[in-house]
Swiss-Prot record:
It comes from Arabidopsis thaliana (Mouse-ear cress). Residues 30-104 form the U-box domain. The keyword Transferase applies. One of its GO terms (molecular function) is ubiquitin-protein transferase activity. This is U-box domain-containing protein 41. It is an enzyme of class 2 (transferase).
Length: 559
């Protein structure tokens, strides 16, 4: 791999003909290292995310799987190559970078060459692979990778959403068989889509999934295991027979039936989340028929309510499709998609993948601009859960989330939920710096001065929690807080608030006055302790929190 001296080359320059294409030469430090395949060191033409989170050239992963080799990366780790998901956001970014650099887009590498590179690495690898990664033709099921995660937090959602929060499911062994499905080419009258992005906005996935020979569908077959011969239940067979035809009316009826069956039955959600049904849902989710798209999106939400379905749905390639619908689908479909991304983001295993595939920015746009209140509320909850991991916090900050969220707090729009996202962002250095630069202290102090509103108590407590996170280990906070008149407001909160708020306000005042509270009181670990304490006070934890406080937060659709 060459350590830090990686370079990328265009494979199409290796031609036996007299005509060759010459590209401008670049220094290795001009190519962002994340654009290079860790195995070959070349610019990726078809990047994919593997199960362990790294991004590789698809062909590199395929060759490693075929040879039963798991490479040792520069950081000393060995990736899990058992499943791949197309990284369309990375592909779009690489192509945009090539356009700016005025060079051709990278072409797929030569298979024989990549195999030679991998075999050379195998010969030089001092340690054998810890185990053989299953090849595309293997029939053995993938190992279980999901530990049980409790989801027993209180909720004020409807019966559908309450079901997921009341259940604690066992681990799952995800499989991701993808079958090619072609929708009949009958005439139609497309409905007007409600676009949430301007024409100048770069899309990471739009337009990729329109046809049956979509690159996405063909690419995903690499990680599939064929289960088409497995027996069908009577319910699945009834739905399957309607979805497999070419008549749009049959598609609508099949999706309505699937949506109805999975609305309240936990057992049917599990039994109907099969590779066959998911394959049809992928195709129908991008339909230009209003009812087809809406019912497909609602069906995805219903299936995602069961914990053991969450990773399977993400691994089956739904996230890029959901993002497309969130950007340009109908209003009702956007509501369901926001709810689906929220539901899928509850699973820790999905958080990184959803962020990598480009969901953060569309969710932020939906939170700010969607015509649907339900979509905005579920987008906020999805962002909260995604921002529980550091990489997504960084993505949110880079997407300009801080000024957007602070503006919404100032205007009083979805304040309590947005404050939860801000508290997560304040826990990372970039987020804390952006918030302090964005006048967050004065805005939050001003919010504390306000009285009234249905969720004012929750917003009040969350404001204090964000201020506590901002004050920890930051020398700028004291001056900004004094300038905003925070001491007087916090003293009033300390006097009149509940016990949790009083404790937090006291610690902020102590930090402002420069007394006590050294690193042990306001260090890095203290931030996590205080934030967890705030959520646990209502019977929740950071991983369990579903957004329901004081009975005023439920906006998810009836699915």
């Amino acid at each position: 791999m060459g350590g830090n001296k990686q370079r990328w080359f265009s494979f199409h320059q290796r031609s036996s003909s007299a005509t060759t294409t010459t590209l401008p030469q670049h220094k290795h430090d001009e190519t962002p290292p994340e654009f290079l395949c860790p195995i070959t060191g070349f610019l990726m033409s078809d990047p994919v995310v593997v199960s362990s989170g790294q991004t590789f050239e698809r062909l590199s992963v395929q060759v490693c799987r075929n040879l039963g080799y798991i490479p040792d990366l520069l950081d000393g780790t060995r990736p899990d190559l058992s499943t791949v998901i197309p990284n369309l956001a990375m592909k779009s970014t690489i192509f945009s970078w090539c356009d700016r650099q005025k060079v051709d887009h990278p072409r797929p590498p030569d298979a024989a060459y990549v195999e030679g590179v991998v075999r050379a690495r195998m010969d030089k690898d001092p340690n054998p692979s810890p185990g053989q990664s299953p090849g595309p033709g293997d029939k053995d099921p993938e190992p279980e990778i999901l530990p049980p995660v409790e989801e027993n937090s209180p909720s004020d959602y409807d019966a559908v959403m309450e079901a997921i929060r009341a259940r604690s499911k066992n681990s799952m062994s995800p499989t991701t068989s993808l079958e090619s499905v072609t929708i009949g080419q009958s005439s139609y009258h497309p409905v007007r889509a409600v676009s949430m992005f301007s024409s100048s906005t770069t899309s990471s996935s739009s337009g990729v999934f329109a046809g049956a020979d979509s690159p996405f569908r063909n690419a995903m077959s690499f990680s599939s295991t064929d289960h088409s011969s497995s027996p069908m239940s009577p319910e699945e067979e009834e739905i399957f027979n309607k979805l497999r035809g070419t008549d749009i009316f049959d598609h609508e009826q099949g999706l309505i039936l699937l949506r109805k069956m999975t609305r309240s039955s936990e057992d049917l959600r599990v039994s109907l989340c099969t590779d066959r049904i998911l394959s049809f849902l992928r195709s129908l989710l991008v339909s230009r028929y209003n009812l087809v798209q809406t019912n497909a999106a609602a069906s995805v939400v219903n299936l995602s309510l069961e914990k053991q379905n969450k990773v399977k749905i993400v691994r089956s390639g739904f996230v890029p499709l959901l993002i497309d619908v969130l950007k340009s689908g109908t209003t009702e479909a956007q509501e369901h998609v926001a709810g689906a991304l929220f539901s899928l983001a509850l699973e820790d295993e999905n958080k990184m993948v959803i962020g990598v595939l480009g969901a953060v920015e569309p969710l932020l746009h939906a939170l700010r601009s969607s015509e649907s209140e339900r979509a905005r509320q579920d987008a906020a909850l999805a962002l909260y859960h995604l921002s529980l991991i550091p990489s997504n916090r960084t993505r949110l900050v880079r997407a300009g989330a801080v000024p957007t969220l602070l503006s919404m707090v100032r205007s009083g729009d979805s304040t309590s939920r947005i404050l939860l996202v801000l508290c997560n962002l304040a826990a990372c250095p970039d987020g804390k710096g952006a918030m302090l630069d964005g006048n967050a202290v004065a805005i939050l102090v001003g919010k504390l001065r306000e009285v009234g509103g249905g969720d004012s108590e929750a917003a009040r407590e969350n404001c204090v929690a964000v201020l506590l996170t901002l004050c920890q280990g930051n020398l700028r906070f004291r001056g900004l807080a004094s300038e905003a008149g925070a001491e007087e407001v916090l003293m009033e909160v300390e006097e009149n608030g509940n016990e949790r708020v009083k404790e937090k306000a006291s610690k902020i005042l102590l930090a402002m006055r420069g007394g006590g509270g050294g690193e042990s009181e306001f260090g890095e670990n203290a931030e996590a302790r205080e934030w967890n304490r705030m959520l646990e006070a209502t019977g929740l934890s950071r991983t369990q929190f579903q957004g329901g406080q004081n009975g005023g937060f439920a906006y998810s659709s009836q699915f």
